[in-house]
Swiss-Prot record:
One MF annotation (Gene Ontology) recorded for this entry: phosphoribosyl-AMP cyclohydrolase activity
Protein name: Phosphoribosyl-AMP cyclohydrolase
Binding-site residues, Zn(2+): C92, C109, C116
Subunit structure: Homodimer.
Gene: hisI
Length: 147
């Protein structure tokens, strides 16, 4: 990756400077929040390693690192529902990425839903936490897409 090391930079350089200095965690990952570029809705939260971040910058498609599979993946490589990146941002200390995307096919979640955030935390009559579906319509059948 062509970015400079965050450890070699003064805090002001990281927070106010114009050089990309992503701060990856001990596992070499950085959190990525992905939102719909039009609505602003959060579609998913995933992780990127240095290679995924660079591929995203270079290609304009969203690339992530799967912790469970321990591998790099391009969003949509199995489903065809590619995320086209319209804007990328880093937070103040460059340890989180925010990408605004155009979501191909309308669904970002592997469950077939538009967003991975399709359940709201409410309380039942006893006050216990309860998950309530919101925007939970499936746009595709995962069993047919991920064979």
């Amino acid at each position: 990756m062509s970015a400079s090391s965050p450890s070699s930079a003064a805090p002001d350089d990281v927070e106010e400077g114009l050089v990309l200095r992503p701060k990856f965690d001990a596992n070499g990952l950085i959190t990525c929040v992905t939102t719909d570029a039009t609505s602003g809705d959060v579609l998913m939260v995933a992780f990127m390693n240095a290679e995924a971040l660079q591929k995203t910058i270079d290609s304009g498609d969203a690339w992530y690192f799967s912790r469970s599979r321990a591998k790099l993946w391009r969003k949509g490589e199995s489903s065809g529902l590619v995320q086209k990146v319209l804007e990328m941002r880093l937070d103040c200390d460059q340890d989180a990425v925010w990408i605004k995307v155009e979501q191909g096919g309308g669904a970002a979640c592997h469950t077939g839903r538009r967003s991975c955030f399709y359940r709201r935390i409410d309380r039942d009559d006893t006050g216990a936490p309860l998950l309530t579906p919101v925007d939970a319509e499936r746009l595709f059948d995962p069993a047919k897409v991920y064979r």
